[in-house]
Structures are given as C-alpha cells and as structure tokens.
Amino acid sequence: FAALALFAALPVLAHHSGAMFDSEKTVTISGTITEFNWTNPHSSFKVAVTNAAGKEEIWAIEMNAPQNLMRSGWKRTTIKSGDKVSVLVSPLRDGKPGGSYRSITLADGTKLDGTGPGQNNSDPAYPAAASPAATTPAR
C-alpha cells in the first residue's frame, strides 16, 4: 500500500511551480511565432522579438494544458510559425526572455486570454498580474 501511495504522488512531484515567473508584473511583446507546442502538462510557444538594442531574441512562453486552453477558444491550429502576434506575459524573474502566458492578440485583432490556475487571475492561489496601467513594454 505504501508503494502505491508513493507512485500516486510522483506526478505531483514532477510538476514544477510557477515561482520562476513574476506574477506581479506583466510585459507585452510583439513579434513572430517561431514554434508552437500543443502538449501536456503545458503548451508553449516561442516568439522572435526585436529588443531595444535592435537584436532579435527568442522569448519562450509557457501556457496552460491544452484542455484548459480549449475552454477559452484555443485550438491546435490557433497559432503557427510565421504568425505576427502581440503577447502579454508575466516575465521570468531572472530577466531572461520568457514568461507565463496571460493573453495574445493575433494579427486579425482576435484576443485570447488564458484559463485555469494563474491564467485568468481567478484562482486565489495565484496572485493577479499588475493592472494594465502598470504594464511595461518589452526590453
């Protein structure tokens, strides 16, 4: 029985926390999708962004699981490499180019926001992002 309990706990231990993201801040980045992964436990995508120094950097954006994203209108085909987007993220605390997805605006003006813990700001276990007035531009 003890071995069964240990096995049941392993998936929980394998899942990381969101502590690497600064959920008190948001950053808006604009660029071109270079990769989209529709996978469990987290979907993700990468965006090529031109930074303030005029150099291209790739932002790695972590999202929620596909089943949660589908509740807010996402499909496996919502974004693809080459798409121009604007993305609101909670940035990585270490300052590297990346973050936790909050919302995306597609080239046609369609806006999708996140769902699930830490994504729609309705889960008290995850602090809400800063107000839109406190949103900072990408580096």
Model segments located where?
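Boundary at the C-terminal end of the N-terminal hydrophobic targeting segment
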Residues: 12-16
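PEST-like low-complexity, intrinsically disordered acidic/proline/serine-rich tracts
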Residues: 19-139
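Sec-dependent signal peptide recognition
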Residues: 1-3
